[in-house]
């Protein structure tokens, strides 16, 4: 079945410091998976995280170690022909947790199958509804004037016209004033959202969200702690502005629990956080049945993970709040022979077999961590 499984770490500087409540990034480490079948078909996947262990339970180094130690021997031991579902069932039975690693493996397996069938990965997920996805830009320099200038430049270039601000690392009032100043500078026609990255207590949320709602902000992402799902539900019921669940979503099980208690207005669906493209589509289905709006999230992946996400998001029946698949644009270097196509505020989803990308392996060799 499988001839080789390789895990590659690639450290690429960002175009500017990217400030979150949990860390400030100046370099992103891409975790790439390359699987080759015995008949020579290559599949790529990505398991990139944010800020090492600052954001979640898996780090680039732990993902590589676990794939090399556990996933790789398991895949190479498969002799009988198994389809993707059978292979994923075997992995689930043999390996607990490791959602990001499992997502990367699943992506590579789906790309192999899609190439074998000569179809895009989106076809294996039910077929796409859209060929283009709206993509916002995150303003995260932490400097109000710089963020305003950056936003205006993006609008002028027709690259982004919706913006998200990372807040939560400064005193609450400082962050609120920063956001509202940017919203006023950009005007009523431009959508501005915030991501608190779980930094506020429930009392702080009440104070901050009220001001942000009054200031014209139209989406508040994960304002309180992951563990406090009851607080998230109370905030959702209390405010008119949309409250979005992010870090609290770790796959279909958590999506069901949040939906059952009306715990959010919007779900930020992330393929890695969900455990795979298939699971991300299941999260989207739960949201739709519960009347919860959808947003395509990112782990600031490079082009492999971003376009894999795009294939999944292209199949969603609704995508009311667009996506944030800007990860490759945050990096100073590309690892593709042809970069992803961003134009007119959107990302074009390739219609060629597999993920529809070609990794530049010479460039990868130059950049990889040895």
Swiss-Prot record:
Its cofactor is Mn(2+). PROSITE patterns: MR_MLE_1, MR_MLE_2. Its EC number is 5.5.1.1. Gene3D superfamilies: Enolase-like C-terminal domain, Enolase-like, N-terminal domain. One of its GO terms (biological process) is beta-ketoadipate pathway. Disulfide bonds: none annotated. Pathway: Aromatic compound metabolism; beta-ketoadipate pathway; 5-oxo-4,5-dihydro-2-furylacetate from catechol: step 2/3. PANTHER family: O-SUCCINYLBENZOATE SYNTHASE, O-SUCCINYLBENZOATE SYNTHASE-RELATED. Homooctamer. This is Muconate cycloisomerase 1. It comes from Acinetobacter baylyi (strain ATCC 33305 / BD413 / ADP1). The gene is catB.
């Amino acid at each position: 079945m499988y001839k080789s499984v390789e895990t590659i770490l690639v450290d690429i500087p960002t175009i500017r410091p990217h400030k979150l409540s949990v860390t400030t990034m100046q370099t992103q480490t891409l975790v790439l998976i390359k699987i080759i079948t015995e008949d020579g078909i290559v599949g790529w996947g990505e398991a990139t995280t944010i800020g090492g262990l600052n954001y979640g339970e898996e780090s680039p180094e732990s993902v590589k170690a676990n794939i090399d130690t556990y996933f790789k021997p398991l895949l190479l031991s498969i002799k009988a022909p198994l389809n993707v579902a059978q292979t994923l069932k075997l992995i689930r039975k043999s390996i607990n947790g490791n959602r990001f690693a499992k997502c990367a493996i699943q992506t590579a397996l789906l790309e192999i199958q899609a190439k074998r069938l000569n179809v895009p990965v989106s076809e294996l997920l039910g077929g796409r509804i859209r060929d283009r996805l709206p993509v916002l830009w995150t303003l995260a320099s932490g400097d109000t004037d710089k963020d305003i200038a950056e936003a205006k430049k993006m609008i002028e270039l027709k690259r982004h016209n919706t913006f998200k601000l990372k807040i939560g690392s400064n005193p609450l009032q400082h962050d609120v004033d920063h956001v509202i100043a940017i919203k006023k500078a950009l005007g009523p026609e431009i959508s501005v959202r915030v991501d608190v990255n779980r930094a506020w207590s429930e009392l702080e949320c009440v104070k901050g969200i009220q001001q942000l709602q009054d200031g014209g902000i139209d989406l508040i992402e994960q304002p309180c702690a992951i563990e406090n799902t009851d607080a998230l539900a109370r905030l959702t019921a209390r405010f008119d502005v949309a409250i979005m669940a992010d870090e609290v979503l770790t796959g279909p099980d958590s999506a069901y629990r949040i939906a059952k208690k009306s715990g959010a207005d919007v779900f930020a669906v992330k393929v890695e956080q969900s455990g795979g493209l298939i699971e991300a589509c299941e999260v989207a289905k739960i949201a739709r049945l519960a009347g919860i709006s959808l947003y395509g999230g990112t782990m600031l992946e490079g082009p492999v993970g971003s376009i894999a996400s795009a294939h999944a998001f292209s199949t969603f029946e609704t995508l009311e709040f667009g996506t944030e698949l800007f990860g490759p644009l945050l990096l100073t270097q590309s690892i593709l022979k042809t970069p992803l196509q961003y134009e007119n505020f959107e990302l074009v989803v390739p219609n060629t077999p597999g993920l529809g990308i070609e990794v530049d392996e010479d460039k990868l060799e130059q950049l990889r961590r040895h």
